[in-house]
């Protein structure tokens, strides 16, 4: 957007305008950089699988101009995509049933072709001023439904990180990172979902309800995977 471009210009950065579906613009932008950080994704969840495939193409396009250069390419993914009955670690992989695996697969493909490509997995809560992520989604759901909710006892846990700490993790990955790595940018590692729902309940002055999985699908809809 123009507003975002102005913010970057004020910091002394040069703005290059591109589009996730304009692969030539992505190639041109990546070719002109000493390092590339990819954080863009179309969050229209009504077209989630389609958008995941578009992200695959975007990653492969940018990677194609970085082959053999050793210039770092950091691609953003998510910790919430990993499923395990224990705290997840960097060596865990995205499930085959998750369309978002397309991004991880693209990183592995271009790394095999000679690109210094790494994954930065962000937790479901990247919080701080200007938060546009999952917590605002939960707050809006509670406003719309008239209550905050968790599934069963809400003892599933979310990781979290402040947005400035996440930015620092990207910088360190560029400046000091090793070749073809996976990073988890985590500040707080074990926040019970029930505690998040309770805070939303208190903040909005609405009830807090425990839902069964079937009830949760009606309440959270596409977000159920992340709330479970």
What do these predicted ranges mean?
Residues 2-60, 64:
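NAD(P)H-binding glycine-rich loop region in Rossmannoid oxidoreductase-like domains
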Residues 42, 54-99:
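Conserved Rossmann-fold NAD(P)-dependent oxidoreductase catalytic core, especially the SDR/UDP-sugar
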Residues 101, 127-137, 144-145, 172-183, ...:
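Glycine/proline-rich active-site loop of Rossmann-fold NAD(P)-dependent oxidoreductases
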Residues 105-129, 134:
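Conserved beta-loop-beta element that borders a ligand/cofactor-binding pocket
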Residues 114, 139-151, 206-211, 215:
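A short C-terminal helix-loop "cap" of Rossmann-like NAD(P)-dependent dehydrogenase/epimerase domains
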Residues 123-157, 163:
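NAD(P)-dependent short-chain dehydrogenase/reductase
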Residues 167-225:
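Mid/C-terminal beta-alpha module of Rossmann-like enzyme folds, strongest
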